[in-house]
Amino acid sequence: MSGTRVLVIEDEYFIADDVRRVLSAAGAEIVGPVATVAMAQQAIDQANFDCVVLDLNLQGESAVPVADRLVADGHVFAIATGYGSPAIPEHLKGLPRIEKPYDPKALLKLLEQLDCVKAR
């Protein structure tokens, strides 16, 4: 993951910090974390990143519009959820996902499978 820029979209501070530490230890550069839908949309507009970890519920607001934009723009990303499959809209169910709380090894494996480095 060395040098891979990962945009972290997560509203829970301790979870975002855990993701930041795990990915940083693996050599990734962290963009964010950002905690709201508005901040996520702004980061997509302004930030340079290779892939995204996206929580689908940001401060009680659905981040589905963010996911839809990432799909439309062709970005590589994984959905993060603590609510399981029923919380994911049907049109997003085929996307890579990880359950919260994150298992650090599972998170790294998922991002390697997404091949974020080639996304650059």
Feature locations, PLM:
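Active-site residues of response regulator receiver
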Residues: 55
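A Lys-centered signature of the CheY-like receiver
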Residues: 100
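Non-catalytic signal-transmission and effector/linker regions of two-component phosphorelay proteins
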Residues: 1-5, 89, 103-120
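Conserved acidic carboxylate
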Residues: 10
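Acidic, metal-coordinating helix/loop segments flanking the phosphotransfer/catalytic sites
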Residues: 33-51
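Hydrophobic/aromatic residues positioned on beta-strands within the core alpha/beta folds
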Residues: 80-81
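Acidic catalytic/metal-coordinating carboxylates
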Residues: 60-65
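Two-component/phosphorelay signaling modules centered on CheY-like receiver
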Residues: 13-32
